[in-house]
Amino acid sequence: MFKRGSNRATSSSQGQQPENPPSLKYQSSSSRYSFHRQYNTGFGTSPFRISPKYKPDSRTPFSFDGTGNVGPESSLNEEESNARWRPSESSFDKRRTFHGAKYSLSIGKEVSSIDKINSPESRSLIIAGKSHLGIYTFDEDSKTITNVHDFLQTAKTNTGITKNTSSTLRRTTKKISTISDVKAGFYNHKNYVAICGTSTSVAIYDINKTSAIDNPVVTSLSEHTRSINSVDFNMVQTSLLISGGQDGCIKIWDLRSPKISTTRSDVSINTGSDSIRDVKWMPSYEFSNDTNGLSNRHFKFASVHDSGLLLKFDLRQPNQAEKKINAHSGPALCLNWHPHQDYIISGGRDGKCCLWYVGDKSNQVGNISSTNLNSSNPATHNLSSSYPLGLSNTLAFPELTINTARSMNKLKFRPKYETNVFNSLIGTSSMGEDSDVSVYSLARKYIPKNVIASSAPSVGFVWWDDDTIFNIDKQNTVTGWDISHEPTVLDNLPKNTIKWRDLDGDGILFLDQKPGGYLSQEETVLTPGSGENRKMPFTHRMSSATANSFTGGNNPNITSNTSSSAASFSKNPTLGMSQLHQGNVLGERSTMSKHAQSVNSKFSPSVNSSPWTNPYSSPHHNSIVSGSESALHAVNDSFLQSPYLIGLDFPHILNTIRNTRLAEFNRKVESAALLELKSSPTEVFKFLARELKFSYKYNSIETKDNGRELDSSSTHGSVDSKTNLMEKLGLSENNTWTHLIKYTKSHDSDEVISKGTELKTPVSDKSANIEKSATNHKAETNQDENSSCINSSNQVKTKNLIELITLCDKNAEIYIMLEDFSNYKIWLLMRDSLLWDLKVLTESMAVDVTADQEVNDQSSIDQPWKKNDSFTSLKEARQASVASGYSSYSATDLSSSVNTNNRHSFNEPTHLTQTPPVSHLKAQLQGSKETTTISRADSIQNSLQNDIIEIRKLRQSHGDRAELAIDEEEEGEEREELTKRAFEEDENNKQFINIPRRESGPSALMPSPSHVSSQSEIPSNPENHHQPRRPRTSFIDSFMSQLRSPGSSNVDADRESTGSKKSSMPSFSSSAATFLNSKKSQNANHNKLKSATEVSDILESEFATQKSWNGSVAKTTTQMSGITALMNETKKLENTITPPWSSRRLIHQLYEQSVASGNILLTMAILLLFQDMFQLVDTETVKNSIAEFTELLHRYELFEIAAELMKNCPYEDISSSSAGFSSIQLFCDKCNKPLVNESSKEKIIKERLEGNSSAMSRFGYWYCDSCSKRNTLCCFCNKPMKSLAISMLNCGHEGHFECLKKWFFDENMDVCPLGCPAILF
């Protein structure tokens, strides 16, 4: 012993070493290289050294500290000494207060099994591996573990005599088979160790024979025919050894016989062909407080098998299994008996640990004297018989099930006396690369008590005492842990949480739980089946499924508590939401069980008396409510204690509340199917995913002469029920700004274009006689081709808009059917914005065609005035309302046609002496086709273009005055006079330009806008044409103009008569126009107009250059006119203003809102429909969204919707990922091996290279190279299926497609060709 504070030394095979400072050592192991440091772990004040070797892993409780040093780690072996380091108290307190790691040693050889030597004073372990069988001792004072002897490692001298191992002798290692299990004997045979493995023999070693001259092998038992998986010594009759292996036989050997037969067992039990994974004697620990005594436990043993069976036997009747239980759905891998009660816990590949009661129901076993198996009468004990499979009841249910989600490798009860079996602890280890040793309390099956993390997956462990566990891992390290010093998992878990359930759940879950512990409340629990009603303990630390295990479901005397807390629970106002799901516990939805044998229905007798049905058939839901609802009846009101788990189905609750409040309002009878659909959020999602339109095919849009009309239901909502509902809810479309658009005659683009060809300005018949020059004709021919291409593009855009409008209206109808008004209005907003775009696009197309027909064909100018087209009137009214600055229609826009004189009266110009040449108006107007939205500046441009056309018409209509030639001097004088008058008029008018006319009286220029309406209008030709009265600006437009431009409200009323598309001087009543007018009144000297001819020339030159309105006229000799400058400034303001109904702006905002609110369907619909048009997000985001949405559709089994989405997906990398080829591995029907057929493929390829071109026809996957057999033949023709084949699901028989087609269709058969009794069709 060492004193505190004194120097410590370490003894080793090489001597003693002084204490070393903290440092890192380079240590080699069989699997990796790592750095390790050893130091005191700090339990109390006792100095000791330790600890296990850990890699810096997130699973281990050790990690690198802030200084870069490794946590408490060491690497010890038999040949290497270990330096010790004891940290100071202060440094230790900063690092860790306690942990449970006590011992650690790196063995350096492969190990696979461990057991303790059943001699308390020896403190030894036996560890076995493929080439290692060693005895290890540990010291609790020094906290060290040492290898004492390796029975498989010896040294030979020259004389051939084997001596103890020495460093001077050459070492040899004896190898045995892979060890499956190692066990040590008890009492008189405590020096015996049995090992078994992949060989067919069990080797018995005497651990006391450690000298070289002694042979430690006592005997070798080899009656098994296949590898042995498990061996075990009997604790009472210590000479009895039991073994079980892959041959399905259980062998019992008696080691007391003086001449042991190594090839014949004393008892042999044949369980058939079912392999045995584990076999154990029932333990007989001598606990001081055990009142039952040893009784007859030593006669009992049990085994688990590959089929999942658990069998219990009695040695006195080995030909009959006392218990036969279907314990697991897959192979059962391990079992262990409770230390003193009739319980067995089993583990399997299905990841479940199941607790089974295997005691006698009467609890009174006959006192039969012990049967002594000795050599005096060996034949009487050689019982070889097969147990009858039908005699034992296999229908049993576990007392408790712990789900670990990993295949169980080892599990063992803690060897401690527990009055209540549910206070017992079990240690488990699993298969896999991420497996630790987990310690569970049966009172808390969902949360382990301790998780012992090691540097590598565990391969075996053993309980030394109540608190100490020794573990070996795949890094060949043995580690000892004291679980009493280990923190529990519960210490690091939150005690309350709130989570969203998945889409198939209840929406939201509240969980509040007190910390609790790992012990059950009840101190005593009677043995199941004792005939007495057991107490039914229920602790807040346990789930309802765990509570079920206390109630003894197999006891028919258990009565159900009819006044259960479940009824009061449903009436509790705070928990009343559970009533939303009648038949479910706490509102949790029912689930289906996959395996009938895994059900937790040991309360089945009490279920019948329950008014609720049991939706659960399996306890294997890692949830507090995973048990049967009958548990609510079997317990008292303590069920309402912690943990509280409340599930709320928010959509269902809100829909119920809303439907209740709107019941009187709706007053309509809905179908049961619709009501059921609305009550389930999942079904609503599926319904919307199926019904909503997410895309449209661009290929379907073709240019046709007759066009395609928009569905009337998508434009004016002809359904009366929908209209009435909208009006009741205040959602009527009569107040929308597209209301007037919807009731036009047609939205077809072709019709609109034809109507847009109508001219609105009266001209004389002489316009048809205009002669065109050859140069202008050639230029206009090229312009006609460009115009045709642009018109074709506009037609495609128009039909795309019509398609999108139809889809928006369709989606809106889907939402209105579900009474989802918010999403309904969203789709209406998008539809209306697209209708506005459609109107603007068709207007621009109409203007283009108007200009073409004006220039090319003047003969049809009289026809439009014979019609009164509403759409043309709307177009005309819209351009007239540009003066208001408010983009909406008013009721006065639809004015009737009356007989009236021409709106404009122009003085006859005397200086127009010749017919002007045809201008490049068509080319100048091409810029208007590039935009899809007509702003106020665009309307100004169109109006000025029409003014130029009117000036030309006036020149033609006054062609008789052109004969009066005026020489250049007279023209110069007149221009100077006109310039002077224009300047004076510009000062007075500040905005308007009046074209003078030569008259007998004084030259009359229009003095002000107010005089325009009162001035007498003179017709432009002798004939008075009847034309529609120009639309007047409505009161609403005037009112909005005043709101938007308060400074100009006093002149708007006077300018009302001039705000029209046909006006040669359009009015500007906005605040910007007012500001510019006042600015230009100060600089009027720079805004002179010389004559009407120059007005036309200047405007034409501006349009021809196609420059922005911010630029100036290219002519250096001509100053900028007042209108041009005003239009330039107005265009600047218009470029910075986006109307609120802009489809790009509106849809982008709606998309952002849907993303923020988590509306998946709306987000994807907007993204898929409008991404190409408006570029809402980047391409990568679109691809990710489509991929995630497709995965979501697959989760809801909406495969047809996902397939349609992928079919129309424009991104090949997304569509090809789901529609590409998939690799499917085929297996042979006979040998179950993969069908690779590489050998035959090489042979056939070689034949083809040699010249046999038809050799490849023999290759295929209809045969197997491994077993040289053909696969399943056709059930009709009995030939190999080399081509397309189909399978019948009822019976599983397969056949050629053509053969079965002939059988079922041609011969009209309805059964399988092989005569299966089931009718297929």
Swiss-Prot record:
Record carries keyword Oxidoreductase: no
Gene Ontology molecular function: zinc ion binding
Predominant cellular place of this UniProt entry's protein: other
Gene3D superfamilies given in the database record: YVTN repeat-like/Quinoprotein amine dehydrogenase
Zinc finger (RING-type): 1274-1316
GO-annotated biological processes: positive regulation of macroautophagy; positive regulation of TORC1 signaling
Biased composition (Polar residues): 7-18, 593-611, 898-917, 1010-1022, 1035-1051
Biased composition, class Low complexity, residue ranges: 23-33, 551-574, 1060-1069
Superkingdom per UniProt: Eukaryota
InterPro entries according to UniProt: WD40/YVTN_repeat-like_dom_sf, WD40_repeat_CS, WD40_repeat_dom_sf, WD40_rpt, WDR24, WDR59_RTC1-like_RING_Znf, Znf_RING
Similarity comment text for this entry: Belongs to the WD repeat RTC1 family.
Name assigned to this protein: Restriction of telomere capping protein 1
